[in-house]
């Protein structure tokens, strides 16, 4: 799952290369732990702490640190020159294969970026997570600790002007440049975090396990992007170590698709990445020591210390595979495909006992250079490399590239750029001089090409919206539908672009298409009237108007409740076209559930309260913000389908703290409904009369001790104004989540 069939790096070891990491290497062993934590005692409780993944107190740079501002001081050409120098300066403590660390750096970058998965946007290289557990100790990342240590002098020199997250990814891009490949571009802008996040990489309790993520014939559970716990993609020896290239192709196709790669991009990454470096399996993998997180303190974070020979250089063991893909492992060319199709292949084992293929009947013996000047070698390939020839779709693609290598060059350049940047969001977030033109997968939005509305225009537009006949609930739900598609994980979605009016979002069940169409029709009329009559070239986009209309409704609802609030509004959103919207790519943003609207897709089995926390996490809201948003949206009547679940008020449409007051009323007794699934009934404790209905999305604010503590604050008699102000602030945060231009 690591280098798998497609990493551009060959192996793991140390050198230039890189490949997967290795099923041959002993995996981390769970250690007995003590004492028991709350999570151990009550594993089914929701984890509210996940809403505060990176507290500012954890950063040594301080809450006011501005990475783009620091990066602006950086001499990027000097940085690149220094990285290039590191690549060709072999160190005795970890000698470079062929005198070049390029393959190793490619693998490092690939394995950082390649953890990205489309279903929830988690993973990727955007935060420098490879520095921390568990990624720094994954079996697939053997010896990448060496790659990062090689870069430490560069990081030390440039300090906070370059993040580790950027440097780790940039090094792989430099490696390609240094070996004669023309890259498509590069964008900086990844800001470091200072502690790991808890990410569900799988339910298995052993590394390299696969038993908990598959069902049926071989159906990989969502949201996982890898076939095996602790690997990036697939097992390079084949599924569960069975050396079957055709079966491996199935796993490759599935896992790369979950990283947003199609068949051609997948093949390009495997062929292109494996045109450099080598894998490492010089000897008995049992002689390799523990991973960094389990290594003795005196090793200072260095893991996988090997007692096989010198433990490095010609004796290196990383993946346990010993493969050199081409006769020119430090130079770009079409050698991978020329060898793949130029020989017949037979199944063999590496010196470490891992399955791989060797050119049949001794063909090509001595034609592959040894990394340290030893006798020439025979051509070798991974099981997953042979998949590029045996799978009919991959074969058709790679045979075309064999005849037209210039097409491979272009395909690899673009696929590599996508791999490194897929989790960074819109191109407006990219920094530096080498940013390529916007790509469809970046969800492009047009630049503002008109004068923006001013305060007077905003006031007039609010009045028109509120006089349009649309209700507070309709306006709030529409704005929420647009903005809440945002994911903090990969910076996708949000209101900017106005894609709520486009496929696929306008047809999502969660967005109530029929009602949405009615609201958008009215708002489009207001937009057209304004744009056709405004002076000075001023216009308002539908994206801006949707947000403005929702905010106007919030202000009205607060005023109706006796509270004056002002929701901040910053114009500048633009409207994307259907042509610049990849319907298939956007489909993964469709919510399975949205507890803020009390929506759940039919058939969803996960506990609603857990899905609510997950939704809040992706929106980037804190526990207090989640609490005030749910309570406010219930009061505003913004439930999906007009449901009354959780609407604990006799004046829906008015912004009040009634949700919390009535939820915490001990005069109400709750029980599961006999009439409806996932519904609870709140009855008067004395008379037994039904008062309210609710879902777990509502009741969790009374049952979970952390959330109840927050709910109590908003239920207090002195909290009415605070509640309205906090709701307005949290609302504005969600509306502006994708406004990176305001940061």
UniProtKB/Swiss-Prot annotation:
Cross-link for Tryptophyl-tyrosyl-methioninium (Tyr-Met) (with W-110), residue positions: 233-259
Covalent cross-link (Tryptophyl-tyrosyl-methioninium (Trp-Tyr) (with M-259)), residues: 110-233
Chain intervals with Polar residues compositional bias: 1-15
Processing after translation: Formation of the three residue Trp-Tyr-Met cross-link is important for the catalase, but not the peroxidase activity of the enzyme.
Binding residues for heme b: 274
Reactions mediated catalytically: H2O2 + AH2 = A + 2 H2O; 2 H2O2 = O2 + 2 H2O
Gene Ontology process terms (BP): cellular response to hydrogen peroxide; hydrogen peroxide catabolic process
Top-level taxonomic group: Bacteria
Catalytic site: 111 (proton acceptor)
Cofactor(s), names only, from the UniProt record: heme b
Textual note on the cofactor: Binds 1 heme b (iron(II)-protoporphyrin IX) group per dimer.
GO molecular function: catalase activity; heme binding; metal ion binding
EC number of this enzyme: 1.11.1.21
Residues covered by region (Disordered): 1-40, 490-511
Keywords carried by this UniProt record: Heme, Hydrogen peroxide, Iron, Metal-binding, Oxidoreductase, Peroxidase
Annotated site residue numbers, Transition state stabilizer: 107
Iron listed as a keyword: yes
A GO term from the CC aspect: cytosol
InterPro entries to which the protein is assigned, alphabetical: Catalase_peroxidase (IPR000763), Haem_peroxidase (IPR002016), Haem_peroxidase_sf (IPR010255), Peroxidases_AS (IPR019794), Peroxidases_heam-ligand_BS (IPR019793)
Composition bias type Low complexity, residue spans: 16-28
Enzyme class name: oxidoreductase
Gene3D superfamilies on file: 1.10.520.10, Peroxidase, domain 2
Primary role: Bifunctional enzyme with both catalase and broad-spectrum peroxidase activity.
Family stated for the protein in its record: Belongs to the peroxidase family. Peroxidase/catalase subfamily.
NCBIfam families noted in UniProt: cat_per_HPI (TIGR00198), PRK15061.1 (NF011635)
Protein name: Catalase-peroxidase
